[in-house]
Design a protein with these regions (language model features):
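Buried hydrophobic residues that stabilize the cores of well-folded domains
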Residues: 1-306
Length: 306
């Protein structure tokens, strides 16, 4: 489910209401990569999303290949000729992020690189549920079991505060301050008559020449496009477009960079329960296809095991 807040995030976004209503506890993304004119290779890559009882994401983790080893298998055919086949074996790391909430507000996000590095972000909110402070720490885990976290040492990496000023029903200004209480960035968000974001402008106080703008487009109730434009290094324009079927289910997404198509994504939905079944990601420049199959685990039976 694309939203203005997550349009350019690499991580998938889910609708908590649907997750809760269907009692989904976990979604596993099984990933296969394929190059054009080559056989698909299953490297056992996965992404897993776990949810709490409110349908909110509680943990996200994925496997990444850190080493590849070639293995040769020697055999003989029926005529006695020696055949040598080469296979790849992989060594994996599991990278994870855990999420903790107070009500629907995210109050802690903890990243773990799979080894010994932990980085956490703590969030505080005002009475209007607006984010007022973000503290980022490097942390250590005192537990010998990596699946259990016991807080050891904390080193503060950054501390940001957020102050808000509402100019009208359609505009909100947010000033970002560092740990010395000095302003370093301003964000001005404009909303339409339905309260939806239509653009966000960012200006850096200490480098006023750096400007960033996000624009959002809608068709009826549907979110159909997001565009980012920035000039921090070289000028870059990112644009995502979304298409929906007759049931208002997302079925196509295109991602552009400086008007060049970089990804074309197809979403296949199960007609019986309207759950996403698979994702096909086409990279035209590298001539590759990523095929993602989704497996759902509910409070009862895994959908793929039915």
């Amino acid at each position: 489910m694309p939203t203005p807040e997550t349009a350019f995030e690499p991580q998938h976004n889910f609708n908590p209401e649907i997750i809760k209503a269907k009692n989904i506890k976990k979604i596993t993304f099984e990933i296969i990569d394929k190059k054009d004119y080559e056989v698909a290779v299953d490297k056992n890559l996965i992404e897993i999303y776990e949810f709490n009882t409110d349908g909110l994401l509680s943990r996200y983790y994925f496997t990444s290949i850190v080493k590849t080893f070639e293995r040769q298998v020697v055999s003989k055919n029926r005529k006695g000729r020696t055949l040598v086949k080469t296979f790849n074996d992989y060594v994996y790391d599991t990278v994870s992020t855990s999420y903790f909430y107070s009500g629907n507000n995210l109050i802690l996000k903890r990243y773990h690189d799979g080894m010994n590095y932990y980085e956490s972000r703590y969030y505080r909110y005002d009475s209007l549920n607006q984010l007022t402070k973000e503290l980022r720490y490097k942390e250590t885990n005192n537990s010998p079991d990596r699946s259990v976290f016991i807080l050891g040492n904390q080193v503060l990496l950054s501390e940001d505060s957020f102050q808000y000023k509402k100019f009208s029903s359609g505009q909100l200004k947010c000033t970002l301050l560092n740990n010395e209480n000095r302003s370093y960035k301003e964000k001005i968000t404009n909303f339409d008559s339905l309260g939806r974001k239509i653009n966000v402008n960012e200006i850096y106080t200490s480098a006023a020449w750096i400007m960033q703008e996000n624009k959002y487009e809608y068709s009826g109730k549907k979110f159909v496009a997001a565009q980012f434009e920035g000039n921090a290094n070289n000028k870059v324009i990112l644009r995502n477009t979304y298409e929906y079927d007759e049931k208002d289910e997302l079925y196509s997404e295109k991602q552009f960079k400086n008007e060049t198509l970089v990804k074309e994504i197809s979403y296949v939905t199960d007609k019986n329960d309207s759950l996403l079944n698979s994702i096909i990601i086409r990279d035209p420049a590298n001539k590759t296809i990523r095929i993602v199959r989704l497996r759902y685990d509910t409070g009862a039976v895994s959908k793929s095991d039915r």
